[in-house]
């Protein structure tokens, strides 16, 4: 069996990692991970044929030659290798988690820090037990600051990811009604996210906290954090902010000891105010000039269908269909209500991973949508469909049924909110809007 130290020597010579034979590049290291429906040990030979330098496997019968490296467990080896690499990096690592806004906040932080530093940030949402190790192993030795996104759907997952990423600084964007099934309810969500605070307490790291969020204050007090940097709209904050406008893009005023500044970002949604303020706070902490902070924010444009305002031939569409939970859905509906438009349309899909709370949460969101007095309501998915007799609007069990309806009933000159869980794939409706 090969040790982590020996495997690291291979990594130094071949620093590109692949876990999928469809993404093999010449001289990469192929890690043969297992999934529910596959065992990549069976693809080791194919990976080598396609140009991988070595295949890391945990089943000896697939060791076809000396380029197959046998380890006790491939996932464990990947995580241990990432942890070993992290130990060689003497840089600040900002660990980031939360129920909503993780990826947008990560990208905002990266945009601000990149005004002064060479920054690595998690690509996309590689934020789980596989994605975090892959992210850490993507940090080259010329990187000056790293921003690592950490996601979780059950307790002890953030704690485990912290042992790999070893953040020196941290931020929880918020805690909300997300992954309730895995966490065992909202209190479980709070406990799970607070594992980042517990780790930062252990290593005496810095924590950035939105003072206006009572849950974060409660969690930070329970953790007994020593080094806190506050941002918010009230109280004694290192960075204080004031929302000026949200129609359609966010404009805010922010201040600290040296002065007050204004910035208009390319983000829609009141809920992004605190995400922008977090990036400002972290930029200021790392000694980036106010003008450069604003420059980074102005030059950031959302991607991956998170709060993107898209102008189509017929409508203005808020593309927020990357994911959804009750907290983010409520925020999106409230945001739509606050925006100016002659005609407003809501198209929302089911929210997943809510467990026993699913019926209650979908019923509440349907009521909020109805009470918003929007011009058109379209609900998609079996969870929403269960309440079709209790609310006005169009209800469809499947996206396919909704597609057929939209193909026959044109929506035009409207401000449209398009939002649902990733599995609903509501982006497929966008061409009809």
Task: Walk through the language-model features, giving the residues of each.
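Active-site beta-alpha connecting loops in nucleotide-dependent enzymes
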Residues: 33-38, 303, 322-392, 421
